[in-house]
């Protein structure tokens, strides 16, 4: 089944480093690629590189612009890789292993646990800040949303600063201007 899926999606078994590495060339979300293939539509592959010096990628842009697809592509391919599956990337790509993959995607509000969207995100960020380290991959969609924009942006920047200090790796999507400026003015 693994070999069939690899053939179907163009997956390869790249050389894997024991250290965290994300230097992917022409990476494709395999499920999206299969769906588009059935519709005879092309997929836009992505090149993504995270390094020791630039280990967190902030993605911003308009709604329906591909931010979440990029984030989910990174998450799915990294998880597939760590499960021993072939992944659809170029043979020139470099891949590595993370000890933890932490995700905050979607709306996790809970009536049973009395959690709003924002408090759910805050709880996730608290857990991520506590557990993240230099071998952690963080995947966060719409960072800091669910509250008034100035407060959400300030909270997201404070949390991002902690992730940078802990040398965690990550892909984070946002609409907040302050996080875009943070990315331009800070290392990491």
Give the residues covered by each predicted segment.
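ATPase nucleotide-binding head domains, primarily ABC-like/P-loop NTPase cores
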Residues: 9-11, 17-188
């Amino acid at each position: 089944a693994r070999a069939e899926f690899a053939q179907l999606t163009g997956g390869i078994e790249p050389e894997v480093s024991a250290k965290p590495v994300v230097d992917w060339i022409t990476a494709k979300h395999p499920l999206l690629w299969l769906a588009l293939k059935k519709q005879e539509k092309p997929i836009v592959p992505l090149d993504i590189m995270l390094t020791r010096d630039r280990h967190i990628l902030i993605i911003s842009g308009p709604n329906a612009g591909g931010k979440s697809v990029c984030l989910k592509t990174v998450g799915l391919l990294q998880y597939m890789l760590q499960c021993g599956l072939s992944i659809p990337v170029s043979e020139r790509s470099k891949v590595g292993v993370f000890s933890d993959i932490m995700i905050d995607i979607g709306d996790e509000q809970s009536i049973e646990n009395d959690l709003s969207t924002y408090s759910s995100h805050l709880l996730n960020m608290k857990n991520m800040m506590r557990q993240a380290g230099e071998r952690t991959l963080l995947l966060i969609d719409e960072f800091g949303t669910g509250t008034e924009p100035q407060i959400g942006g300030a909270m997201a920047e404070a949390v991002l600063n902690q992730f940078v200090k802990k040398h965690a790796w990550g892909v984070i999507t946002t609409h907040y201007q302050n996080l875009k400026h943070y990315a331009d003015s800070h290392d990491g």
